[in-house]
Amino acid sequence: MIRWHPGHMSAPHYYDTDRLCVVLSGTWYVASGADFAPEETVPVPSGSFVRRIAKSAHYDGVRKGAAEPAIIAITGMGPTRAHLIDPSKPGWRHV
């Protein structure tokens, strides 16, 4: 499980295997692609499911000003690791 607090997002990254994600509480904000644009993220409310396809670039987190953190249960085949699209930048961003 992961908890994203308001105003924090991951940098664009991908995984070697599919990730299956269920939002347990709060609203999670997600986007696909290698270009970081937090204003273009899509809200995913509690109870929703997201499938991240292996090797597809994406980023996610909770937008600044959100009422609460988002808690997400993530599963998939392992072991795996995140591959940052731009390893010269931090793996998470304060937005």
Where do the language-model regions lie?
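Residue-level recognition of well-ordered beta-strand positions that form the cores
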Residues: M1-R3, T27, T75
